Amino acid sequence: MIEKQSKNVLEGIDALIDMLEHYEDTDKKRQKIKEKENEGDRMVHEILSELNKTFITPIDREDICKLVSSLDDILDNLEAVSERLVLYKIKKPPKYMLEFAQTLHKASYNVHEAIALLRNFKDATQMRIFCKEVHTQENEGDALLRKAMAELFNGKDAVEIIKIKELYDDMESAIDRCEDVADVVGDILVKYA
């Protein structure tokens, strides 16, 4: 079920990338991302419900909760970005948004692949590689944020600066949540592999 949730996150990111690459019908595209976020919320509820009914779990309950929560946070950030793009009446995507989204996609892909391997712990080495890649992408996200902010703060329109800063912060936060998932997967590996 967690694997389905991570796939849903990837689909949400794909929808955001589509929105940024083809920046028209933004309200319709925002709604598609909202649907992915709602689907994610349903999955969280379902997973936690099943967890409450299950006496013995293959991994610690706390780790399951952390995975589920961090994956949900990624979708929450995506929804916030798409909402702000529409509500703030952003005419075209800010310069670094697509690059943030692509970095987030790479990180989420690696998260998804690591989670898929959790099912049977067969390839701990490959899981570690996926987790290490997520950390690399998180560092790329941090560097991109610094670069984007430095350029942004050279602007003159304070309102525009605030709007775009919030968008960049949400994207970087989503990448950070991918790193949180990778950290939990790493913890699980230490405990069980």
Model-based region annotation:
Residues 1-193:
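Cytosolic, long alpha-helical scaffolding segments
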